[in-house]
Structures are given as structure tokens and as C-alpha cells.
Amino acid sequence: PAIPAGGEVQVSLKKEYPGVKPWTAETPNLYRVTYSLNGKDSRSVNIGFRTVEIADDGAVLVNGKAVKFKGVNRHESHPDYGRAIPREVMEKDVQIIKAHNINTVRCSHYPNHPYFYDLCDRYGLYVMDEANCEAHGIRNSGMDISRKPSWKKAHVERNMSMVHRSKNHPSIVFWSLGNESGNGPNFVAASEAIRAYDDTRPLHYCEFPHGHKAVDMDSAMYPPVDRVENWGKQKTSRPFFVCEYAHSMGNALGNFKEYMEAFESSPRMVGGAIWDFVDQSLRANPAGNGIYKPAPFKGVTQAYGGMFGDRPNQANFCDNGIILGNRNTTAKTKEVKKVYQYMAFVRKDGSLTVLNKYFHKPLKGYALYLVSLAPGGNHAVERMALPEIAPGKSVTVKLPSAAMQTGSLMVLADARFKLPEDVKELSAKQLEHVADECEAYEWFPATVEKEASVKAPAVLPAVSVRQGDPVVVQGKGFSASFKDGMLSALRYGSQDLILPGCPVALQAYRSPVDNDAWIRGKVEGKMKMQNMKAEYSDVKAAVISPGVARITAQFRTKGSDLSFSGEVAWTVFGNGIINASVRMYPSAKGEELLRLGVTFGIPAAYDQVEYLGLGPWDNYRDRRTSCWKDVFRTSVDDMFFAYSRPQDMGNRMETDWVALSKPKAAPALWVGSASPRAPLEVSVLRYTPKELNNAKSLDRLPEKDKVIVNLDAFQMGLGGSSCGPRPLAKYQTLSEATPLGFVLAPTSALLNLARAGLGVPHSPVIERDGDGMVSLVSSTPGAEMKYSVNKGPEKTYRKPFKLPEGEVRAWAAAGKSGKVPPTSPGERKFPLVKGQGEWKILSASSEEPDTGFAHFAIDGNPDTYWHTSYTNGLPGFPHSIAVDMGTRMKFTGFIYTPRMDKDKGLISQYTFSVSDDGQNWKEVKKGQFTYHYIRKDPAVQRIDFGKPVEARYFKLDARSPVKGGEQSATVAELNIITQ
């Protein structure tokens, strides 16, 4: 028909085309449609055919099949171009996203450049397109524009302009109404407008309450893993999409695997989007070019808020990417690729099961590479062709050798990447490259570890001890000095290996990673762990057997609120082996610690690193899924990672040994765990934790004048969010009696001898839990341990034993070689304790039936809690709860664990009292709890009395709430400090 000027005509065409291939992110089939006006003016557009539906169980179906959306949020940002990203950068972003098994992008928080959607159509990515409705700072306030009628038109128009512009892109499967801008009627109007025009895509908005009819799915930001699991158990037809999770600020992405497992546990948990894809940093060049008060500049840095004199700012809070601003990948990127991968492997009973986790794509033409790991040498490779595996199905194949069935095995699979047929072996570096290229892989540790057996020499070289401070020990080709009982100098041959001023020292502080926000205030502010230093006493040195000397010292730390005491023992052999045993007892149990171990410095020239442990990138107890155990070769500079704000990095879990050398030289120093069954956590960097923490940007780091070696018994997990939940409980590290053993040697042969032939029997630490069960723990697992109770007969330790009160003495039996006496016995006296299981609630001002019983406060489970009444009246503050311990107990403080799932009912002002009859009370402590990080994750409160008290009953009076106006109080756990 004729179209008048300014007019509009809508034309509908219908035609059947047989054999059309549908579009999915896995199979991005596109068709080119060209339309013209009178054959003169023409346009072309790519289209894809696909459907999006919601199933009765809450699953989202693409073309009739349930899909998990493995997503990431993406801002348009580049350090050189700012928000105006060139097309080639957009394409590189999409290539990186696809290469790391991400199938979904949330356009946060505005529609992106049109070309980006073309790329998503072509490469295959699901997209949540989001309207530019962002009023973060004024939502849910008197200025909330989502509730102002004058802003209704803006909300509707911004949403509809997004829909009209991008409606023909098959990649867009969700419309999002905006971000964190309130949940008023203007968003309901926007929802109604979209639905009237396009009802083919589900609607999302994170601010509406769950179940709200204006959107088709529930949503949340930064929930803890257990909450995701609980949402998945709800019986509803509404999908749940976690629009922001795994906040990737700095050294982050802990417990990422557990989030994916939670998504896969329920049909309605359709997935989520990591926050976020790329650091929003800016490139800053030499000093004076915009950087605010810079230190002497030595190169290019990633600038963030505040470095340009801008006030206010959010510092590095926009540097949350799994890749850096310059598009370099990180250990976070590797973890995402591994956890999001579309194949799963299970080794069992000599067979390998391969599961296809794609939703639409069959595994066709895939090759399987089976790599038997032989750390330190080349790894044998065998190929196997996989039969075609349909989506969601699996096949099981027989592993061809006994070594593959029980040994350390790497399984890799891909259809595009092919190893040449003549390649029968891979070096560690080649395996790293293949794993990076392959679509999916899995490492299976050996099911049975073969312990090396090295015969001890019949005669050890002589060793001499020169008394004084320092004590000097000399043997064949080496000398070692011990100042104040700690190794302060070491010379192997002609090489001095301990840097003057950097002796071996105890360490319980790491430069906080961004995700340590939940505990940083406590660690640095209250506990002052960065100031911890040890004082040594009772230093003893002697030759204890032919060719063996021992130096021992008692220590107690000062400068920090949490202190440690214990013993260090150095066993020095005439051949240069030095075996260290450290027993550390904290002044308080159960305090969160970022790390615990030792540190020392070596000359800067020894910057080449070889190690047997998890790698090839850095890993932590909750971010290690993408790693495998091998001998890796790297450098100190390569173990450093250029986060925009320097912080802890470079950690390697399960490290058996690390060797340090100058470039193109043999290793001069070998450092290993004391036992193959007690690997260490190790990092080797140019900087101390304090230096990393003090440098707020890369250009402010000091000169590279040393190498710092950190040997840890443990490090805290990274956690999954700097603005949300702390690390999972299983990845947290708490103060407790801790043994640490390690070995230094000049050669690998002597290191192996030290660990397998000349093992020093390390006497155990002695620990007792709240129920009175005593455990003995040695830094040499498997060692035979002896003990006596109250000076009674000697017993062999086999399992924890009950001790309500008394003295325990524990020691190690003689080692296998018979050449080395055990380290000195440990002794501990324990006051009377009755476990929480024997306690009873004496009284409570009120309780909430079923969900908030008073006895939940002493049940040992922090996931349950006493909640004052709210369904049968709301009494308001003050509240009280009293406990009967069943007998008189001597204690020095109490522990209040707040409710952990949310910041509700938190107690501010309190009074703690004790009684011998349960009626007459004596006030012991009065004060106010301090919360360093309230949002979503209150901190455990540990209150010391200053001097011991003795009583049978105790009572906590809650006098005021943290949040003004709250009426209820909650207590997850109440306990006492007995030592």
C-alpha cells in the first residue's frame, strides 16, 4: 500500500521453510533476511529461530529444553577508550567469554552498543538486556523516583526503547527492567508496556519481592550458597536467577564451585551472573598525568577512584572483573572456565564416565586425552576417540592401564584442539598449554600415594655448635646461625641464602584481599595481627647425637590482641639438612585468622621458582578446582599478579617442596614440608604482606630488593564476595593449637632424604574441644604419638579421648631411622569443662516457638538461633537468657555468636553476669558489642573479662539493639572461654 509522508504501515508475511535449524547459544544458527522498498531501498538483518518458555517446575526452556544460564555481568569499559569501546574490543570480549564456557551476559546496567548484540547472535550467547533505569542512591527513600508519577513516562520509555531497538536479536532471552532503583509502580507500568508488545521473553528485575507478578522470575544479589540451595527447594513454577553473585574484586572467586552445584541442584535455580567481566580501571601513564599525589612512577598502572584527585570516590570498588582492564586473564578466569565447563568426568572402578552437560549440543567428534602425571618428568599421553554423546547423557569407557586407574591422571577433551599423533609425552608446560586450549578437563589425584623410602646413611657428617647469640652450627659445606632461637643466616657452599634482617619469623597476617572486608577491621583494628612479633626465651643448643644438633626456644608473641606461645625446635644435620618443628598455641581459640605460618627473606637474585604443588596459577582452599598437582617452573615476578590494589596473591596449596635459584643456575635452596603427608601452603613474592598492604596502587610498591618466602600451615579462603557473605565455614581458618613442620636443604637428594629417610619425630600439639575431647596433632602425620594423663602410665595415642580436667603430656616416638631423638614433649593443663551438650537453659525472657527456642543458643549449631517472641507478642528490649552449666566452671570470658543469615536482632549494649545459685547475680562485664562488618554477615563477639571467674550459672542481658526501633533479640550461640 501507499505510505503517506510520516505514515507507518505494518506488513505481515507468512511462509513455511522446511529444515530450519533453531538458534541456541550452543548452536547459533542464523539466517539472513533482506527486505526492500520498491526494490530501491533495502535492509538486511540476521535472525534466528528459538523459543523461550517457563516450565511447571520453574526451569527456563530454550527450544523446549531446560538451560542453566552460566552468566557474567558486563560493563562497557576499557582502560584506554573508557565507555566508547571499539568493535574489535567488543569481539575480543565475546571471544574471551565464549572461550571460558560462559553462555550468558547481563548488560549491566544499560543497553549495550548494537554491534555487541550482533556478536552475541553470531557467536552464541544468551543475553539479559537491561534498561537504563538506575537510581541506586535514592531507591527506597523519600526521593525514590520509581514511586513518583512524574517519572513514570521515563521508566516506560527507557524500557520500550530498549525493546524496540533490540527485539530482533535471538540472543536476547530476558528483558530486565533496570537495576537497584526501587520497586514502585513505575516499574510495574514498564512491565505492563513490555508485555503488551512482547510476551515471548521472561521479565526480570532484582528489586521486586519474590513472587511479584510484574516479573516472571525471582532474583537476588550476593546470597550465601545455603540460601541458594534453600530457594531451590521451594515448590514453585517461578525460575530464580541470581543476577549478581561471585563478586570478583581483586583476588577473589572463592567457593565458586559450590554456587554452581547449588544451581544444578534444582530446576528452578536457572543460574546467575558473576559480578563482573572486566575491571573498570583506567590506564595511567607517567607521574603528573592525572595520578593523585603519586609516588615515583615506574611504568603503567591501573588507576581507580581517588587517583585523579576525585572526591568522593569508591576507590577500586569498580575493579571487579574476572579479567583485567587490559583483557589479560586471571586465576579467576581459569576457575570460571573449569566450573562452567560442559563436560563432567568420574573415575571409578577402573573406568571413566564422561557426561555431556550441554543442553542442545551433542558431543560429536571429540577426542579424549589421558595424561598420566609423573611430576618432575614428562607425562605419558594416550588418545581415545569418544563416541557421540547426546545432551545430558553419558558414556563409560575402560581406562587402558592400571596407572590411569589409580594414579595421578589428567583427562582432557576437545573437538577442535588436536594433539599431533606423534606426540606421546607432554612436559608440564605443554600440559598447561593443552589444558588452557581444551574445552574441558579433570584432574584425578592418585588414589594410593606411594611414599618414597630413602635409606638413611650409616654415618652422618660431623656437626659442631658454637654457643652464643647467635648460636652457630657448622657441618659439611654449610653453616647456620640462630639468633634468639630462629634461623637468621644460612650459607650453603659459597651462597648466603637468608637475607640479613629477614630471619625466619612467625606470621599470622596476610595483606587483606578485597573479599576480606568482612574481617579486615577485626584483624587490623582490634586484633592488630599485622603488628605481631615474637619474643624468644630459654634458647638451648647442643649436639644430641652423632652428626645431629638441636636448637630449641620457647616463644610468646606480642603486639597483637591475639597472641601465640609455644616452642620451635631446629634439628640440624651434618650434611646441611635443617628440620624445623613449630608448635603454636593461641591465647584464644576460635578466632578467625587470615593465615598462620612462618616467613623469611632471601637475596633478590634467587628469583627462579620450581615447586611440586597445585598450579599452574595461584590457588586457595576455596579456589582450586581448576588446578592440578605437578612440578611447575616459574619466576617470582610471574607469581606476582597485577591487581589494581596490591593484596595477597601467589598462594600454592598442597606444596611438597619449592626450589629457589638464580637464572640459568641450579637451585641453591630447597624448602619442603616435613612429611609428604603434610604439604604446606607456599607463596614466593617480592614483597612482605605489610608492603603489599601499604601500596595502594602498583606504582607505589617498593623496589624489588628481596624475595619473601611464606610457608603456611593454613590460609583463609578467599570467599565469594567483598560485599556479601564471608567464606564458607569449611574454608574458614580459626585459631587453634597448630603444628608446623618444614625442611631446608641444599639439594633435592638431601631434601628427599630429610622427608623420607631422616624424618624428625615432631612431638604433637595438644588440643581440647568444648566437649572435653583431647586431640594430639603432629606436623608429621602418621607419626606414632605417646601421652600420659596426670603423670599416669604411658599410652599410645589412637583417637581423641575425654578429659574433663587435668594435665596431658604428649611426645613423639623415636623415628624410623633411629638416629634422631623426638622433639621435646608438650604439656598442657586443662581446667574443668562440661560440654555444651550437658548445659541447660535456666531461663529466657521469651522465645519464639519452633523457630527460635532458647536452647538453640547452646546447641553448638550456629545455623539455629534463639529468637525472642514475636508471634505471641513483641516484648521489646531488654531481653535475657540464662544458662546452667551443671557444675562450677572457671572461665575468662564469653563468646556471643550473632544470627549469621541476616543482620536481624543483633545486640548492641549488654551485661554479662554469673551466679552460684541461679538467683543472686554478680555483674562481670558490661559493654557494647562492636560489629566490623554488619551487612549480611555479623562478626562473632569474643569478650574477655581480664581475670578469671568461677560460677555454675551465667546470664546475658541484651539491653539495646544495633538497629534503632528493633524489638527482638537473637543469639545463635553462647559459650564461655575456658583457656
Residue positions per predicted region:
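Short glycine/proline/serine/threonine-rich loop/turn segments at secondary-structure transition edges
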Residues: 17-32, 404-410
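Beta-strand/loop-rich accessory regions of lumenal/periplasmic or secreted enzymes
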Residues: 24, 400-406, 447-756
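Short coil-to-beta strand junction motifs in C2/discoidin
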Residues: 27-28, 363-368, 591-596, 903-911
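Extended substrate-binding grooves/exosites of carbohydrate-active enzymes
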Residues: 41-351, 357-364, 374-378
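Carbohydrate-binding surfaces of carbohydrate-active enzymes
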Residues: 263-487, 579-580, 731, 747-752, ...
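Extracellular beta-rich ligand/substrate-recognition surface
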Residues: 329, 340, 556-562, 719, ...
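Short, compositionally stereotyped local motifs that mark structural "simplifiers"
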Residues: 757-864, 879
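Aromatic, loop-rich ligand-recognition surfaces of beta-strand-rich domains
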Residues: 861-926, 937-979
